[in-house]
């Protein structure tokens, strides 16, 4: 079986979860099963719940992981909703979310993620109603400007939005190739990534509501208050990493009083656990040589030791 995607930070993921023995493991973003396959092999006492919103990826992984069929349950869902759908929440001992786009999605022309694609789609869940085509051709100039500024952190977001609106007034933009030509190949000051790449990334985030999905997922976990469970999240965008970092920081605090208050009044017992990774973990030099797409990957991990399940 030809594997269409290389899992990032595989050794680092194994290290984070190396002490897990029994219970349930939730792979929130199964993809093509690389992380789960390795963990299934190394942790025979664990049962797995594998989730992905991409039907193609899910079908592939079902075949890839068929030897573990008695230990794994598959669910098609966005990872922000999967915790609502599963049982055995109290037995969760490990949770992994790799929230990047897979190589298969990037390289598949029909999915419309690549700047070279003949399509304009970018939906991770192909049943979703809004695609990149709708965003590019139907959003107002103000909406596009906001997307490019907030998600792409582009200084000339207004100018790019204006160019898109001008071109689509002549003819609707039907492919990623066309969009790439409109935006141009230039780079933003002090950044190695092209403006087009940043703009495409911003559109993809909007199409899939990626930041909202991440916040919803972390918010649900905060309310769930797992116990004796390790959470690891791999992100590929500074905005996502910032969200994860801030949630972990919040969860690790015992005192939640306003900083202006001189003496604690909250009880000083609100911590959900400890941050495992003092700083984000990035790909090794060896991995970068084998898989250049791992260059943006950052992993952070948190241990929920909420023994009283407050």
UniProtKB/Swiss-Prot annotation:
Pfam families: Methyltransf_5. InterPro entries: RsmH, SAM-dep_MeTrfase_MraW_recog, SAM-dependent_MTases_sf. The keyword Transport does not apply. It comes from the Bacteria. It catalyses: cytidine(1402) in 16S rRNA + S-adenosyl-L-methionine = N(4)-methylcytidine(1402) in 16S rRNA + S-adenosyl-L-homocysteine + H(+). Its EC number is 2.1.1.199. Keywords: Cytoplasm, Methyltransferase, rRNA processing, S-adenosyl-L-methionine, Transferase. GO terms for biological process: rRNA base methylation. It is an enzyme of class 2 (transferase). The keyword Cytoplasm applies. One of its GO terms (cellular component) is cytoplasm. S-adenosyl-L-methionine binds at residues 33-35, 52, 79, 98, 105. GO terms for molecular function: rRNA (cytosine-N4-)-methyltransferase activity. Belongs to the methyltransferase superfamily. RsmH family. Specifically methylates the N4 position of cytidine in position 1402 (C1402) of 16S rRNA. NCBIfam families: 16S rRNA (cytosine(1402)-N(4))-methyltransferase RsmH. HAMAP family: 16SrRNA_methyltr_H. This is Ribosomal RNA small subunit methyltransferase H.
């Amino acid at each position: 079986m030809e594997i269409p995607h290389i899992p990032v930070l595989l050794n680092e993921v194994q290290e984070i979860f190396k002490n897990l023995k029994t219970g349930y493991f939730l792979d929130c973003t199964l993809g093509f099963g690389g992380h789960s396959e390795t963990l299934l092999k190394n942790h025979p006492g664990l049962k797995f719940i594998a989730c992905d919103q991409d039907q193609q990826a899910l079908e592939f992984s079902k075949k890839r992981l068929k030897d573990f069929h008695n230990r794994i349950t598959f669910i098609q869902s966005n990872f922000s909703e999967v915790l609502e759908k599963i049982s055995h929440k109290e037995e969760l001992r490990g949770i992994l979310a790799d929230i990047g786009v897979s190589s298969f999605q990037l390289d598949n022309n029909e999915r419309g993620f690549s700047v070279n694609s003949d399509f304009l789609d970018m939906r991770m869940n192909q049943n979703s109603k809004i695609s990149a085509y709708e965003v590019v051709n139907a959003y107002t100039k103000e909406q596009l400007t906001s997307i490019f500024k907030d998600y792409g952190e582009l200084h000339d977001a207004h100018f790019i939005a204006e160019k898109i609106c001008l071109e689509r007034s002549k003819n609707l933009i039907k492919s990623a190739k066309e969009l790439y030509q409109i935006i141009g190949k230039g780079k933003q000051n002090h950044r190695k990534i092209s403006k087009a790449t940043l703009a495409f990334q911003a559109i993809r985030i909007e199409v899939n509501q990626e930041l909202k999905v991440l916040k919803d997922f972390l918010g649900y976990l905060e309310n769930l208050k797992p116990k004796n469970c390790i959470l690891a999240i791999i992100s590929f965008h500074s905005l996502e990493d910032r969200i994860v970092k801030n949630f972990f920081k919040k969860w690790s605090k015992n005192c939640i009083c306003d900083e202006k208050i001189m003496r604690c009044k909250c009880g000083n017992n609100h911590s959900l656990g400890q941050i495992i990774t003092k700083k984000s973990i990035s790909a090794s030099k060896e991995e970068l040589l084998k898989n250049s797409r791992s260059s943006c990957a950052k992993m952070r991990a948190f241990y929920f030791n909420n023994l009283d399940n407050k």
